[in-house]
Amino acid sequence: MPPFVAGDEQHKKLDYFHGALFLSPDGNQLLNDGWNWEPVGRPVVWSLLEWVRGNVWESESGRSRLTIPHQNHYWNQGFCWVDNRHVAVEGIGHPDDEMIAGVRIFDITRPNQETEFAREVNVFAGPSGRLFADGDQLFSADDQGLSIWSISQGALTGRISGFSPTAHSLLDRTLMDTKGGTVRRWAY
């Protein structure tokens, strides 16, 4: 990564604060649950390769950076990669009015030409909490347990009470709960 160059004025214009980072399944992109002053939740996606190979500002203003539609006063919610092209974001509605439990799914390869944001391709009510996905299924975990959703149908297909995973391994198709000093796995 190139060093910071004194006198580089680009950094003075930045008002973006980074949040949780989520690596895409192929390891090529990052999803960031960040925000701007006001505060406005502003999730963005950018190329990890562009970032580490030379453009230290890729996450801020690089050519691969794509913003997912933002929400005032709403960040640090459930996010996950559905596959290498799609991300799921928890929350439907507007936080100034009413947010309902559910997810919005965005295609990060096809920006909306009118807004220049990632294009919303699916939305369905229900999921809330920590999110995980395998391309076909979306998993949402909260204090009551794990809910399993069909992404294509937007329907609840299963529930495991008392199992609230904090980690997901796409490689061996397992979800893990690490509460109470033990690790519980569920293979699907």
Cite the ranges covered by each PLM segment:
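Surface-exposed loop and turn segments in beta-propeller and other repeat-based domains
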Residues: 1-15, 56-73
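Blade-level signature of beta-propeller repeat domains, shared across WD40, Kelch, NHL, RCC1
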Residues: 170-188
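Blade-terminus and WD-like Trp-Asp/Gly-His loop motifs, strongest in beta-propeller folds
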Residues: 21-28, 78-86, 130-136, 167-172
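Beta-strand C-termini and the immediately following turn/loop, strongest in propeller blades
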Residues: 32-37, 85-97, 139-144, 177-182
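Short loop/turn segments immediately following beta-strands, especially the blade-tip
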Residues: 47-57, 108-112, 188
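Conserved blade-ending motifs and adjacent loop-strand segments that build the rim/top face
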Residues: 65-72, 116-133, 153-172
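Structural motif
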Residues: 38-46, 96-105, 143-149, 181-187
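C-terminal amphipathic alpha-helical segment
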Residues: 62-116
